[in-house]
Amino acid sequence: MWTWDQSAGTLSRGGKIVSRGYSGKGRGVNNPSLQGVAGIGPIPRGRWIMINRYDSKNVGPFTITLNAVDSTPDDRHDATGRGAFRIHGDSIRAPGTASKGCIILPRAIREMVWRSGDHELEVIE
């Protein structure tokens, strides 16, 4: 299982940090206290499943779709009501501004994560 640390902005597996990134916008970047604020806070704590990957015309190539592991099998997080979470790349024009809650990681890391076959993610504070 992969682990995303909300406050540190790190992706780990087996206790080893694999990459650094960010989740959230403005004051919400890697700020767990704002996880419930749509469009600003980081991806909410909990378990997620990576269900597919695709090339997005909006957020770029090798985007990974995340579904919350909760009472409803969809990409909406029941506890916060937020949804549409992805793992995708950063903005080329304005680095550090691509997330409204999605996890932003380099493409090589996204490819490695997907190809690992381990599609479970736990988001911790």
What is each model feature region?
Residues R47, Y54-E125:
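Exported/periplasmic cell-wall-interacting domains
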Residues M1-G83:
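Gly/Pro-biased beta-strand-loop elements
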